[in-house]
């Protein structure tokens, strides 16, 4: 199953997050969406820490959303890289 870390657009607009979810749906690929901001302006520290660990990073500075992982756990990247993954 794909994992998509990002923002729920009802809370924080993220066109690329929406596009990633839409692409996976169109491709009929199961995915788990992990919302890193449950409330406006409030990050889920546990989910951010999980994501940073997966990426081997110690800071979220410069980190863009979404961040997508393949079913095997490998990091794909953002929406543009996800689109390339399916070409």
From Swiss-Prot:
Any Pfam family the entry gives: Glutaredoxin
Effect of mutating residue 66 to A: 30% loss of ability to be reduced by thioredoxin reductase
Domain (Glutaredoxin): residue spans on this chain: 1-87
Impact when changing residue 12 to S: 70% loss of ability to be reduced by thioredoxin reductase
Segments traversing the membrane: none
Protein's name according to its UniProt entry: Glutaredoxin
InterPro entries per the UniProt record, alphabetical: GLR_AS, Glutaredoxin, Thioredoxin-like_sf
UniProt family annotation: Belongs to the glutaredoxin family.
Additional note from the record: The disulfide bond functions as an electron carrier in the synthesis of deoxyribonucleotides from the corresponding ribonucleotide.
SUPFAM superfamilies in the cross-refs: Thioredoxin-like
Keyword terms, alphabetized: Deoxyribonucleotide synthesis, Disulfide bond, Electron transport, NADP, Redox-active center, Transport
Coiled-coil intervals: none
Gene name of the record: NRDC
Function statement: Serves as a reducing agent for the phage-induced ribonucleotide reductase, but not for the bacterial ones. This specificity may be the result of sequence differences around the redox-active disulfide bond. The oxidized form accepts electrons from bacterial glutathione and will, in turn, reduce other small disulfides. Can also be reduced by NADPH and by bacterial thioredoxin reductase.
Disulfide topology: 14-17
Effect of residue 15 to G: Almost no effect
Phenotypic consequence of residue 13 to S: 85% loss of ability to be reduced by thioredoxin reductase
Keyword Secreted recorded: no
Record annotation: effect of changing residue 16 to A: 20% loss of ability to be reduced by thioredoxin reductase
Biological process, per Gene Ontology: deoxyribonucleotide biosynthetic process
Keyword field contains Electron transport: yes
């Amino acid at each position: 199953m794909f994992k998509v870390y990002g923002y729920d657009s009802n809370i924080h607009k993220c066109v690329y997050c929406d596009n990633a979810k839409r692409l996976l749906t169109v491709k009929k690929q199961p995915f788990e969406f992990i919302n890193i901001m449950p409330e406006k302006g409030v990050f889920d520290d546990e989910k951010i820490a999980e994501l940073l660990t997966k990426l081997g990073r110690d800071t979220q500075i410069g980190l863009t959303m979404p961040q997508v992982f393949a079913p095997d756990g490998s990091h794909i990247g953002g929406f543009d890289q996800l689109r390339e993954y399916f070409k």
